[in-house]
Each structure stands twice: as structure tokens, then as C-alpha cells.
Design a protein with these regions (language model features):
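Conserved AMP-binding A3 loop
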Residues: 30-33, 159, 166-190
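ANL superfamily adenylate-forming
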Residues: 111-162
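AMP-binding/adenylate-forming catalytic core of the ANL superfamily
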Residues: 87, 104, 247, 255, ...
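Conserved AMP-binding/adenylation subdomain of ANL enzymes
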Residues: 189-206, 213-254, 268
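Conserved AMP-binding/adenylate-forming core of the ANL superfamily
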Residues: 2, 10, 18-63, 67, ...
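Conserved pre-ATP/AMP-binding loop-to-beta segment of ANL
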Residues: 2, 18, 151-170, 177, ...
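Gly/Ser/Thr-rich phosphate-binding loop
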Residues: 227, 249-257, 266-328, 340, ...
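AMP-binding/adenylate-forming catalytic domain of the ANL superfamily
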Residues: 130, 487-509
């Protein structure tokens, strides 16, 4: 029985050692080779003093070493923390400090960018560098080289069970900095089992890994492939057309992406032969526009579309079967295998068909909570509705904060987000994190970041600022500072400068909802 994350790979090595497991460019590791790399990484970490449940952060672009570094941490009995390579040093520093990372795996080039923030990461003990470029040591930190992992002596891993921590994935909250969602081995493995079941994955599949591995959706492409003995093909793309070329060149059978990428892919020509091997495509991270779905289906007539909805806090929640797409193209579908999705009122009682309510996810996919954030964990992870009074220990469920409705047949439809998160390009962006960068410039007196509907992005990040000085170049200066301090997906698409204070709600806070309403039609002409 496979119960631990890394055992997905080990099981493949035992079952079909010569089968291709992981490909990056012209280099392919079979399952035996990948299992050996994961074991070598685990021994390497243990030799560096990694203790049970200690965190290993990996801050690299997508490559073979990234995958083995992540799964090797789990195999050692530690916890892996994939860090989005698009993040800026200050954001990486927050993650390293917040979850008390002990070992950081990165490149010499990225290390140079991180040097100013490393003194603030007080739990960090060792740096592991991937690449041959020399790097100066950092005071107080052991410096090791990834190339030395094969020489590490074999060590017994720390004992863990499937209920223990496996990974921490960082996702933005509605207030403050990104929060770490703690996933157990059971969460990750069960997610792979559920997804591979409804996608009907087999060892013959070749799944293109386009999304960041710091996304649960991106990580899922690996675990789903490993669960069935398929091959995951890694890709760092520059242009949407590169994705199409990779699908054709590598004879990809499964492709996952977020709506902004699908919007672009639906506007391009696809080679005629692709549909002969591309079995399915999946969408999550936001609603796929109907014109985009229609465009993809016209270009890929034999490829089955799976429209999904998920929470990092519970992996994946729902999917719409391809045979229902024509009847219910706006639906989120129903619960994935081994999960139950409830729609409830504020008092926890079930909603009637058509009645809006909060989506609550219960089952094996529910994560362990937010790292180092008991208040947010208590808010989001609460007893599941409708439990029997005799249960002494209540089952916890994820209360999503999303408003949905269920039709007479049990299919779900998304209505809106109850918090103020901005969902852009498949990312969740905290308004306050963007606002902090703007306030730090000292250029404006007030700022509010909000998400405005956008045909390509899902939502666009929009800033409204109050500048009493009336400076003519404030918007340009703020945009330049945001580009310098924030990853691309957090940079505002539009900045509106006002000469009067921003509107307030009854509590004296800036009224984001009012601002969002005023700007609701800002991007209507951007629709394809």
C-alpha cells in the first residue's frame, strides 16, 4: 500500500523500473533512476542534520533537481516547501522565516539575490547550491553542493506515517502575507488517487507539467503521474505557443492550465495531429470563459475537457465530467472521488437547491491547517456540518468562504468569493501585500488594491490611490516600484490616482466593495 508521498515513486520503481517517470528536455529518468535520486537526496539531507518534520525549501526553476529535492525531503522524514521561482527576495524571506526552514536548496544566481534577507531567517542552517557557478559562503550557514548528494552515506530516514506533514504550500490570505497550508502525506496521496481515477490515467500517459510546483494544481501533475506510473514532462515556457509545440513534440496526453493561459491557447492554431494523442485537458484556478472553452473544443475535437474547482486547503474539490460540459458549461461539477461537498447557510444547515450558501469540503483531502496561524486555522477549519451528537471528537472540514449554489441534480455553480482575495492568472493575491509595497514608497496617502473582472486574467489587480500632492507622474512611479518589488502576477494592471480621500465603510475602513463597484466595467473592452 502506498501511504507516503515519496512511496508513489518507489512503488513505480518496484513495479516498472525501466518506465519513463520524469523528463526535462532531452533528459529522462526512469522510475528506478528517479527513486535512486530521491533516496540520494534524502541521505544528503540527513547528512546535513535534517531532523524529523524539519522544513526544506526549494527555490529553483522547474527542473529534474527541483523534483528530486522536494520528494527527497519527504523521503528523509522532513517537510518540503516549494517556493515559486517568480517570488522576489522579500517574499521568499517571509516564507523561509515563517515556516522555520532549516535547509534551502537554490542556485548560486538566486543566492546572490537572497543574501540581504538571509540574516532574518534565523532557523536556517544550511544552503544547498544547484549548479557549478562558485558562490561565497554566508555567515553562520553551512554551504553544500547538490552534486555531492550521490556520495552521501545511506542513513535511516525518520519514521513518519500518512497522517504526518509532507509539504507546506504558500497561498495568499485576504489580509497579510502568504499563509502556509500544511498538507499531510495522506492528503497528497489521496488527491493523486482521486484525480487519476476520474481522469482515467494509465502508465501510458505523458502529462505536461506547465504550472509552478508551488501550486497544489501544479504539484498534482507530478503526483498524479507518479500514482499510475505515467511520465511527467517538465516545462518552463516563455510563450503560449511553446506549450503547443511541447504538446506536439512530446506527444502529451494530458495538459493542465489556468484560465489566462487557456485564453491565449484558444486563440492559437493547433497542429492537426495533436488531438490524436492529447486525451484530455483540465482547468482550475478560476472559471474558464465559455468562448475559450468553445475555441479549445473546436481546435481539439477529440480531447476531453475537465473543468475543476479546488482549494489549496483541500487539494481539489469538484470536477465537471466531459459528458456534462454541453449541458452545464458554467458548472463546477460535483465532488471528486472520496470527498463530500456541502452547501450550507450561516448556521450550518443545508441550503435548498438554487439557494446560495458557503461551500464546505469534508473528507480525506482536508489539509492540516495553516502553519503558525491558529486564528486563521480556527476560522477556516471547523467542525463539518451535520455531525452526529454522539461523536466526541468532531471531524474538521474546510469552510471555503466561497458562495455557491447547487441545482436539482446536485451540480454546483460558483457565485463569488466572500473574502477580498484577488484571483488573477490562477494566483491568489492578497490586497494588503500589494498595498504594503505602495505605502512603502511614501508617494501616496492612501491606497486600496482590488480585483476587477478581466477576460484574460480572471481578475486584474487594480490600485486606487489618494495623492493629495496631485503629482503628474505618480502612477508611473508606483508601477515601476511594483514591478521592482513584486512578481509579475501581482503587478497592477491599472492604477487610478484620485485627489480626494478614498471612500470609507461604517467601520472607518476603506470601502473596497464600493471601489470595486465603481470600477466594475473598466476592462469590458478587453474581452476577446
Amino acid at each position: 500500500m502506498t501511504g507516503l508521498v515519496h512511496e508513489l515513486i518507489y512503488a513505480g520503481g518496484a513495479r516498472a523500473p525501466a518506465a519513463p517517470a520524469l523528463q526535462d528536455g532531452k533528459t529522462t529518468l526512469d522510475y528506478a533512476g528517479l527513486a535512486g535520486e530521491v533516496s540520494a537526496a534524502a541521505n544528503f539531507y540527513l547528512g546535513l542534520g535534517l531532523e524529523r518534520f524539519e522544513r526544506v525549501a526549494v527555490y529553483l526553476e522547474k527542473r529534474l533537481d527541483t523534483v528530486t529535492a522536494l520528494f527527497g525531503a519527504a523521503a528523509a522524514g522532513g517537510v518540503f516547501v516549494p517556493v515559486n521561482p517568480l517570488l522576489k527576495p522579500e517574499q521568499v524571506g517571509h516564507i523561509l522565516a515563517d515556516c522555520n526552514v532549516r535547509i534551502l536548496v537554490t542556485s548560486p544566481e538566486r543566492l546572490e539575490l537572497l543574501r540581504p534577507i538571509l540574516p532574518h531567517c534565523r532557523d536556517l542552517r544550511a544552503l544547498v547550491l544547484v549548479g557549478d557557478k562558485p558562490a561565497a559562503p554566508v555567515d553562520g550557514l553551512a554551504l553544500a553542493h547538490w552534486r555531492d548528494r550521490q556520495g552521501a552515506p545511506a542513513s535511516a530516514p525518520h519514521r513518519v506515517i500518512d497522517a504526518d506533514m509532507a509539504a507546506i504550500l504558500y497561498t495568499s490570505g485576504s489580509t497579510g502575507r502568504p499563509k502556509g497550508v500544511v498538507l499531510s502525506h495522506r492528503n497528497v496521496v489521496a488527491g493523486a488517487e482521486s484525480v487519476s481515477q476520474y481522469l482515467e490515467n494509465t502508465p501510458e500517459d505523458r502529462i505536461l507539467s506547465v504550472l509552478p510546483l508551488s501550486f497544489d494544481y501544479g504539484l498534482s501533475q507530478l503526483t498524479t503521474a507518479f500514482r499510475v506510473g505515467a511520465c511527467a514532462v517538465l516545462m518552463n515556457y516563455l510563450l503560449p505557443r511553446d506549450v503547443i509545440r511541447a504538446v506536439e513534440r512530446e506527444r502529451i496526453t494530458g495538459l493542465a492550465a489556468v484560465p489566462p493561459l487557456w485564453v491565449q491557447l484558444a486563440q492559437l492554431d493547433w497542429p492537426a495531429g495533436v488531438t490524436e494523442h492529447l486525451r484530455y485537458f483540465t482547468n482550475s484556478g478560476g472559471h474558464m470563459p465559455k468562448p475559450t472553452l468553445d475555441g479549445l473544443r473546436a481546435r481539439l475535437p477529440k480531447t476531453r475537457p475537465f473543468l475543476m474547482y479546488g482549494l489549496t486547503e483541500a487539494f481539489r474539490s469538484t470536477y465537471l465530467p466531459p459528458e456534462e460540459v454541453d449541458r452545464r458549461p458554467d458548472s463546477m461539477g460535483k465532488a471528486i472521488p472520496n470527498a463530500e461537498i456541502l452547501v450550507v447557510r450561516e448556521d450550518g444547515t443545508p441550503c435548498a437547491p438554487g439557494e446560495p450558501g458557503e461551500l464546505v469540503h469534508r473528507g480525506i483531502h482536508v489539509a492540516l491547517g495553516y502553519w503558525n496561524d491558529p486564528e486563521k486555522t480556527a476560522e477556516r477549519y471547523r467542525p463539518a456540518p451535520g455531525q452526529l451528537a454522539g461523536l466526541v471528537i468532531p471531524e474538521l472540514a474546510v469552510w471555503s468562504g466561497d458562495t455557491v449554489r447547487k441545482d436539482e441534480d446536485g451540480y454546483l455553480y460558483f457565485i463569488g468569493r466572500r473574502d477580498e482575495m484577488i484571483k488573477t492568472s490562477g494566483y491568489r493575491v492578497s490586497p494588503s501585500e500589494v498595498e504594503e509595497v505602495v505605502y512603502a514608497t511614501g508617494l501616496v496617502a492612501e491606497v486600496a488594491a482590488t480585483g476587477i473582472a478581466h477576460a484574460q486574467l480572471g481578475q486584474a489587480v487594480v490600485l486606487v490611490v489618494y495623492d493629495p500632492s496631485g503629482g503628474a507622474d505618480v502612477a508611473a512611479r508606483l508601477l515601476a516600484e511594483c514591478k521592482n518589488k513584486l512578481p509579475g502576477f501581482m503587478v497592477p494592471t491599472h492604477i487610478e490616482v484620485r485627489e480626494e480621500p478614498l471612500p470609507r465603510n461604517p467601520n472607518g475602513k476603506i470601502d473596497r466593495k464600493r471601489l470595486a463597484g465603481e470600477l466594475a466595467g473598466l476592462f469590458e473592452e478587453a474581452a476577446p
